[in-house]
Amino acid sequence: MRSLISSLDLTREEVEEILKYAKEFKEGKEETIKASAVLFFSEPSTRTRLSFEKAARELGIETYLVSGSESSTVKGESFFDTLKTFEGLGFDYVVFRVPFVFFPYKEIVKSLNLRLVNAGDGTHQHPSQGLIDFFTIKEHFGEVKDLRVLYVGDIKHSRVFRSGAPLLNMFGAKIGVCGPKTLIPRDVEVFKVDVFDDVDKGIDWADVVIWLRLQKERQKENYIPSESSYFKQFGLTKERFEKVKLYMHPGPVNRNVDIDHELVYTEKSLIQEQVKNGIPVRKAIYKFLWT
C-alpha cells in the first residue's frame, strides 16, 4: 500500500505518473474513488486543508475532518496510536499536518493498513506543495532541465523548499537560495544549490523566484533585526519587481514582509495558479496512492 511522506521517496517515473494524472484532471477528466479519508490537521491551514478536502470530494471520497485540539492527542495519545485508531475505524486515507517532524517513518508506514499523505510535518516535508510548485513551473515553462529556480526567504525552516528542491534536482533544474545567513541551513549543500548573498544578483540569475514566508511560529530566537529591514533586503519590492521575470509563493503571504502588498497578484505572479493547481495535483496524489 502506497503512502506519500516525502518527495525524496518518489522516483522520476512516479513523479511523471502523478503529473500525468494532474494534467488529465486539470483538463476535466472525471474519476471516482470509493474510499474514505481522515483529514487530521493539528496546525492551522487554509489552502492545503481545503484543497485536499475539495480534491477528495470531487473524486467521491468521503472526508472526515479532525483537528488536533479535538483529538485524543491533547490527552497524551501518541500520533502512532491515533493512526492505529483511524486504521481500526476502516479509513483508506489519512491526510495529516503535524507540528513535529515525522521521522523515522518507514517502519511505521509499513505497519499500517493506511494510505498516509503528509500535508506538512514540522520543518521536514510538504510533498504535495512540492509537486504543486513543480507542476506549475513545468506547465508554464514546458521544460525544467537547466531552468534556474531561486528560493528566497526562510530556507532553514521551510518544508516547501525541502520538498520542492529534490523534485527540481531530479529533472535537471538549477537551484539557488537566498536569505539571511541565520536562515540558511548549514547542510544546504546537500540540496545541490547555489547560495546567493545578494538577492538582486539572484533575481538577475533566476528564471523564476519562489518567495517563502518567515516561519515565525518555528523561530525560537531572533533571526532578523526587524521585518522592515528583512523586506528591504530580501523582499519583493517595487524596484525588484522591474527585474524579476516570474515569481511564486506557496502561501500564506506576509504582505510587505515577503512581497509588497500591491504585487501579490500581477502579470508576473504565478501565486494564484499555484492555488488552482492544488486541486488537480492532490486529486492525482489520491489516485496515485489508490492504484
Swiss-Prot record:
The keyword Transferase applies. Gene3D superfamilies: Aspartate/ornithine carbamoyltransferase. This is Aspartate carbamoyltransferase catalytic subunit. Carbamoyl phosphate binds at residues 47-48, 97, 126, 129, 251-252. Its EC number is 2.1.3.2. Keywords: Pyrimidine biosynthesis, Transferase. It is an enzyme of class 2 (transferase). Pathway: Pyrimidine metabolism; UMP biosynthesis via de novo pathway; (S)-dihydroorotate from bicarbonate: step 2/3. It comes from the Bacteria. GO terms for molecular function: amino acid binding; aspartate carbamoyltransferase activity. Catalyzes the condensation of carbamoyl phosphate and aspartate to form carbamoyl aspartate and inorganic phosphate, the committed step in the de novo pyrimidine nucleotide biosynthesis pathway. L-aspartate binds at residues 75, 159, 213. Belongs to the aspartate/ornithine carbamoyltransferase superfamily. ATCase family. PROSITE patterns: CARBAMOYLTRANSFERASE (PS00097). One of its GO terms (biological process) is 'de novo' pyrimidine nucleobase biosynthetic process. Heterododecamer (2C3:3R2) of six catalytic PyrB chains organized as two trimers (C3), and six regulatory PyrI chains organized as three dimers (R2). The keyword Transferase applies. NCBIfam families: asp_carb_tr (TIGR00670), PRK00856.1 (NF002032).
